[in-house]
């Protein structure tokens, strides 16, 4: 597993995840609507994930089930979708 990075924030991480979604979708040659439908999502929801935002200024935070559905629709592994070195979650500083 990647090592959490205390200097990184969740907004940056969510945007990188969105970039990975976009790249995988483009590599597959599919539209946002088609991937959204295949993953059981509304097109607007998928668009927000690619932007890395759930609402302006708030990072996207898809459920684990949604991430697996997207990976299945894109024919990729979860490790291909998630950026390395996630930020620390609140409350985990110093925890092992």
Regions found by a protein language model. Name each.
Residues 2-7, 72, 79-96:
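Short, charged recognition helix plus adjacent turn
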Residues 2-29:
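A short, Lys/Arg-rich alpha-helix, primarily the initiator
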Residues 22-23, 33, 68:
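Residues within the helices of the helix-turn-helix
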Residues 25, 36, 71:
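The alpha-helix within a helix-turn-helix
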Residues 29, 53-72:
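Short, basic-rich loop-to-helix N-cap that marks the start of a DNA-contacting helix
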Residues 29-55:
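Short alpha-helical DNA-recognition segment
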């Amino acid at each position: 597993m990647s090592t959490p990075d205390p200097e990184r924030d969740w907004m940056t991480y969510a945007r990188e995840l969105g970039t990975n979604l976009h790249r995988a979708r483009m590599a597959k040659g599919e539209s946002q609507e088609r991937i959204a439908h295949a993953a059981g999502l509304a097109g607007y929801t998928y668009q927000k994930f690619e932007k890395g935002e759930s609402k302006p200024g708030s990072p996207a935070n898809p459920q684990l089930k949604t991430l697996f559905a997207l990976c299945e629709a894109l024919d990729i592994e979860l490790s291909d979708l998630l950026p390395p070195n996630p930020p620390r979650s609140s409350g985990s500083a110093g925890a092992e």
